[in-house]
C-alpha cells in the first residue's frame, strides 16, 4: 500500500499536479478521520465494504466517531466484523438535522452481543427513520441480500418513537440470471410507502396522478395497436379468400401430383408473408 501511494504521488507530479496521498494506518478510515467530518454533514450516502475483519480495536477507539462504543472485540483485541463501525461513523458524521442512507449487510439487522446493544442505543436516539430489506443479486459481484438503513436527526416529533420497516425481499425485477434491480415504478412505489408513513399525502396523490396519466397513455397506444392489427387482418382476410379459391380450383383440375408443386410454393409464400407481417407488428407495433 505504501509503495502504491508513492507511485501515485510520482504520477501526479509528472502531470504537474499537487496531491496529498496517504498510506498505511493514516489512510485507513478505521484508524484515522482524515476529513474531520464528525457532526458536520447534512447528508451521508455510502456503500461500505461488508464484514471487514481484523480491525485493531485500540487504534479504532483512538480515532473516535464511536458514539455507541466499539462493537464486539475478540481475544486478539480486534473488531472481528466492522459493519457497526461504519454504522457508528455515518451516524457520528451527521449534524443536528442531518440525514444518512447507506447499504449494509443483511446479517447486520439481527446480529447479537454488542451489536445488539448498539442497535438498541440507535433506536433510543429516535433518529432511525427507515429500514428496507433487499433481495439477493442486487450487486454485480455480490449475490448476498442486503439492507438499506436511513437515519434522520430532523425527524418529526410524532415519528421519534417509530421506525418504518419495509420487507422488499420479494419485490424486484429480474435483469438476468445473476442480477436483480428495482424498476423506476418499483422505486416510486417504495417511496410512496415512506411518504404515507411520514404523512406526506400530497406526494402520494401526485404519484397516483402520474399513474393515471401513464395508464391513459398506455390504453391509447393499445387502442392504436388493435386498430392497426384489425386493418392488417382485414387485408389478409381478402387474400385468404382468394387463396382458398385458387386451392379449390387447382385441386379440382389436378391430373398429376406434379401439378400441385406450384400450389405448394404459393402456400409457402403466403405463409411467410403473413408470419413476417405479424412478427413486425408484434415487435414494432
Report residues per predicted region.
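A conserved structural/catalytic subdomain of Rossmann-like adenosyl-cofactor enzymes
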Residues: 38-285
Amino acid at each position: 500500500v505504501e509503495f502504491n501511494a508513492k507511485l501515485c504521488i510520482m504520477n501526479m507530479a509528472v502531470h504537474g499536479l499537487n496531491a496529498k496521498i496517504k498510506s498505511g494506518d493514516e489512510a485507513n478510515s478505521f484508524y484515522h478521520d482524515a476529513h474531520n467530518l464528525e457532526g458536520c454533514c447534512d447528508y451521508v450516502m455510502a456503500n461500505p465494504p461488508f464484514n471487514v475483519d481484523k480491525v485493531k480495536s485500540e487504534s479504532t477507539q483512538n480515532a473516535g466517531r464511536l458514539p455507541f462504543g466499539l462493537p464486539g472485540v475478540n481475544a486478539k483485541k480486534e473488531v472481528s466484523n466492522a459493519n457497526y463501525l461504519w454504522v457508528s461513523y455515518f451516524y457520528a458524521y451527521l449534524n443536528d438535522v442531518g440525514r444518512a442512507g447507506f447499504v449494509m449487510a443483511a446479517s447486520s439487522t439481527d446480529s447479537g452481543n454488542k451489536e445488539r446493544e448498539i442497535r438498541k442505543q440507535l433506536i433510543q436516539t429516535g433518529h432511525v427513520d427507515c429500514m428496507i430489506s433487499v433481495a439477493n443479486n442486487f450487486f454485480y459481484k455480490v449475490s448476498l441480500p442486503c439492507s438499506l438503513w436511513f437515519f434522520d436527526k430532523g425527524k418529526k416529533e410524532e415519528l421519534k418513537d417509530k421506525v418504518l420497516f419495509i420487507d422488499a425481499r420479494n419485490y424486484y425485477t429480474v435483469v438476468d440470471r445473476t442480477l436483480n434491480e428495482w424498476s423506476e415504478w418499483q422505486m416510486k412505489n417504495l417511496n410512496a410507502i415512506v411518504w404515507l408513513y411520514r404523512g406526506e399525502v400530497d406526494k402520494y396523490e401526485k404519484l397516483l396522478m402520474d399513474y393515471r396519466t401513464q395508464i391513459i397513455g398506455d390504453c391509447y397506444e393499445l387502442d392504436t395497436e388493435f386498430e392497426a392489427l384489425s386493418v392488417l387482418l382485414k387485408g389478409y382476410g381478402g387474400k385468404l379468400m382468394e387463396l382458398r379459391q385458387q386451392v379449390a380450383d387447382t385441386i379440382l383440375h389436378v391430373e398429376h401430383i406434379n401439378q400441385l408443386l406450384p400450389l405448394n410454393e404459393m402456400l409457402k409464400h403466403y405463409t411467410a408473408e403473413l408470419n413476417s407481417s405479424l412478427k413486425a407488428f408484434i415487435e414494432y407495433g
